[in-house]
Curated annotation (Swiss-Prot):
InterPro entries: BON_dom (IPR007055), Lipoprotein_DolP (IPR051686), Transpt-assoc_nodulatn_dom_bac (IPR014004). A lipid is attached at C19 (S-diacylglycerol cysteine). Keywords: Cell outer membrane, Lipoprotein, Membrane, Palmitate, Repeat, Signal. It comes from Escherichia coli (strain K12). This is Outer membrane lipoprotein DolP. The keyword Signal applies. Interacts with the BAM complex by associating with outer membrane-assembled BamA. Interacts weakly with the amidase AmiC and potentially with AmiA, but does not interact with NlpD. Changing Y75A: Loss of activity. Mutant cannot grow on 4.8% SDS.
């Protein structure tokens, strides 16, 4: 049997330390997000489960699966559908499917008619979301942890638990970010 060289042992130990550090940092980040989110942990879990259930229900429809690109976001039981479909009928069917999922209290259908966007536009959307979140984070007018940001084809969608004043400020901040074509809000208002 061949023994491991001291260098192999050292490299293995360093790699394992990196894995442990990544796991600890990742767990801390998730814990911090859960702690600062205004929703209860139970509601956060319910929303995550709702997203999975809606995605699963949509993926069972062969035409939607083949012809449309739909992303699902859930917040406080409200479901936001964004993406592209070739026609209004398919978009309406996606909304009906989402409404039939247990736990979906309300469905916002923001699916646009057209061809699904490509990887380049999807990457740009991720960058826009990052810029919007950064601007919200530095704002004194909005508690950024109360706002969920989704971007699709340059359109920014905002959801969350906010005051009316925070909602206006968040929409204004998002609208000023370069690359944003439009801002749509679906907030739940708190007093």
């Amino acid at each position: 049997m061949k023994a491991l060289s001291p260098i192999a042992v050292l490299i293995s130990a360093l790699l394992l330390q990196g894995c442990v550090a990544a796991a600890v940092v990742g767990t801390a980040a998730v814990g911090t997000k859960a702690a600062t989110d205004p929703r209860s942990v139970g509601t956060q879990v319910d929303d995550g489960t709702l997203e999975v259930r809606v995605n699963s229900a949509l993926s069972k429809d062969e035409q939607i699966k083949k012809e449309a690109r739909i992303n699902v976001t859930a917040y406080q039981g409200k479901v936001l559908l964004v993406g592209q479909s070739p026609n209004a009928e398919l978009s309406a069917r996606a909304k009906q499917i989402a409404m039939g999922v247990d736990g979906a209290n309300e469905v916002y259908n923001e699916i646009r008619q057209g061809q699904p966007i490509g990887l380049g536009e999807a990457s740009n959307d991720t960058w826009i979301t990052t810029k919007v979140r950064s601007q919200l984070l530095t704002s004194d007018l909005v508690k950024s942890s109360n706002v969920k940001v989704t971007t699709e084809n340059g359109e920014v969608f905002l959801m969350g638990l906010v005051t009316e004043r925070e909602a206006k400020a968040a929409a204004d901040i998002a609208s000023r970010v370069s690359g944003v074509k439009r801002v749509t809000t679906a907030f739940t208002f708190i007093k």
